[in-house]
Amino acid sequence: MTALFGARYAWEQDIPVNIHFLWELEEEIGSPHFESTIKANAKEFATDTVVVSDTVWVSRARPAQPAGLRGLQGFRFSLQTGETDQHSGTAGGAARNPVTELCQVISECVDGRTGRVKIPGFYADVVPPTKRELEDLKNCGFTTKDFKRDHMFRSLRVDDPLEIMKRVWMMPTFEVHGIAGGYQGPGVKTVIPPKATAIVSCRLVPNMNPKKIVRLVTEFVKGKNPDVKVSAEHELPAYQGKTTGPYADAIRGAMKFAFGKEPVFVREGGSIGAVLSMEKVFKSDVFFLGLSLPEHGYHAPNENFDWRQAEGGMAAFADYFRRVADLGKPNSRKRL
């Protein structure tokens, strides 16, 4: 909505830009039809640059200009050792327990206390943050106290602010999202289940190849327990955008104009599949002008957005459109 109002103000001031708005509504299911849709309408959507407004500031203290997204590689680990539930009193000790075995395999993959992935070669292609990125992290206004409050954490694996930001934005992960198997209702039911499943994902950073990660994880898991079936799901490479150039400078200037402070370059810990599709189909660089704050409950049931950010966002978009128009030749209309 802030971008719409910004476009309205640009139109009222006769700023010479052509603006296309594109809503992507399949993100939470993997955007299965997005790329084919924009490819079929590529001529209509032809553009000089793309701006995505789907990112979060580090804190209210400084505007954030993300320049990268983590990727994602999903997995399903499945293990079946029998045909039906067994009573632990009659078979316990002799029967294999697939839940226990999956937990053992997972503990071999990742250190549950530190989060360090133990699969050989997993970190081989990770590019360390640049000196400028580290300086921006130190000056972005992030605090451990606010991070714990905004996300309602009781404790963290680390408390150092810089280390937290590096882990969330610039390092890959191995996360277990759920384990299914056996009895999960109230009370006690002493069964040994015949099968179990674990849902796992790895967040990836730029320069990591999802297919290589699939190979490394599969070979490692099979080496620990050859009976575990590993299925790869939801492949999405990481994205590294530009931090220099006329369009990046236009966003930077617009954010400073609207919020009174120079934005810091950061990365996002999440993934946006549509970004890679737009870069590929439109052959245009993709930039980010997000406005959400950590306390807005991003993607949570109580997600919200305050009027101060909306007001600043309208001004930022209107000023960005003006700056982009200034990049064109006299009497030309830039396309966004």
Predicted regions and their residues:
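C-terminal catalytic subdomain
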Residues: 104, 186-215
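Acidic-enriched catalytic cores of C-N bond-cleaving enzymes acting on peptides and small amides
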Residues: 42-43, 67, 74, 88-179, ...
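Acidic/histidine-rich catalytic neighborhood of metal-dependent amide-processing enzymes
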Residues: 1-68, 329
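Short beta-strand/turn micro-motifs at beta-sheet edges
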Residues: 63-67, 185-190
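Short, low-order "capping/linker" segments at domain edges
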Residues: 239-257
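A short beta-alpha structural unit
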Residues: 201-205, 229-244, 268-269
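Alpha-helical metal-binding/catalytic segments enriched in His/Glu/Asp
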Residues: 1-30, 75-79, 92-113, 200, ...
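Zn-dependent metallopeptidase/amidohydrolase metal-coordination segment
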Residues: 78-80, 85-87, 102, 170, ...
